[in-house]
Design a protein with these regions (language model features):
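Terminal transmembrane helical module of multi-pass membrane proteins
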Residues: 118, 141-183
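Single conserved hydrophobic/aromatic residue that forms the stacking wall/gate
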Residues: 1-6, 10
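Small-residue-rich segments of transmembrane alpha-helices in multi-pass membrane proteins
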Residues: 11-17, 66-80, 122-136, 179-183
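Hydrophobic/aromatic-rich structural module bridging two neighboring secondary-structure elements via a short loop
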Residues: 54-71
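Membrane-interface helix caps and helix-loop-helix hairpins in membrane proteins
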Residues: 57-61, 83-90, 110-120, 139-145, ...
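Alpha-helical transmembrane segments in multipass membrane proteins, preferentially the mid-helix core
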Residues: 105-112, 129-142, 159-167
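Hydrophobic residues within membrane-embedded alpha-helical segments of Major Facilitator Superfamily
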Residues: 17, 36, 43-44, 50-51, ...
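Helix-coil boundary and interhelical linker segments in multi-pass alpha-helical membrane proteins
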Residues: 14-34, 78-95, 134-150
Length: 183
């Protein structure tokens, strides 16, 4: 709870910075895609904060659905500015579209996924997150080194963190997962 709420200020500041950057450069696509990314980030952490803060069991189950669904939105929202601003060709558009289709699939089937297994859900998140590997060479050529390094580092942190998320016998495994996410 504290990790989600505490980082909210930084996410809002980051969103404002990105939107102003797009406005300053007169780039409507950048403003739109940065807004999609920032909004998906804020919505996920708001959902996560509510899910972890509300003790009512019935409300908690509904909020868990929203929380888990918003993870798909954040992954797609993260891909959107990279793919559409830096790769506005068929490859970038295809990867971005595929990412949003996986998000829609994950949200629609979230009730079933939640009943089956957290591991199945995690595998779908990881597949969506590493979708970029299907077009790795063009992505490496299109992204500046810093952007690529940050994207890979973020992907590795999230991916490695899923080990702790699924390690339910480990005390505070969920808190450790959140630390990886904030990284």
């Amino acid at each position: 709870l504290a990790s989600s709420a505490a980082s909210d200020v930084y996410k809002r500041q980051g969103l404002i910075f990105l939107i102003l950057y797009g406005i300053r450069h007169g780039n409507a696509l950048a403003v739109t895609t940065f807004s999609i990314f920032g909004s998906s980030l804020i919505v996920l952490y708001l959902a996560s904060t509510l899910y972890h803060a509300i003790p009512n069991v019935r409300a908690k189950r509904a909020l868990q659905y929203v929380d888990h669904s918003c993870i798909f939105l954040l992954i797609a929202g993260t891909y959107t500015p990279f793919m559409l601003n830096l790769m506005p060709n068929w490859i970038g558009i295809t990867i971005c579209t595929a990412c949003w289709l996986i998000a829609a699939f994950g949200i629609i089937f979230q009730p079933w996924l939640m009943k089956k297994s957290d591991k199945l859900n995690t595998c779908l998140y990881l597949f969506q997150g590493w979708l970029v590997l299907f077009a790795f060479k063009p992505v490496v050529e299109a992204l500046p080194f810093t952007g690529l390094a940050l994207l890979v580092a973020g992907g590795l942190l999230y991916s490695f963190g899923t080990i702790f998320y699924n390690w339910q016998r480990l005390p505070y495994h969920h808190a450790v997962w959140h630390l990886f996410v904030l990284g």
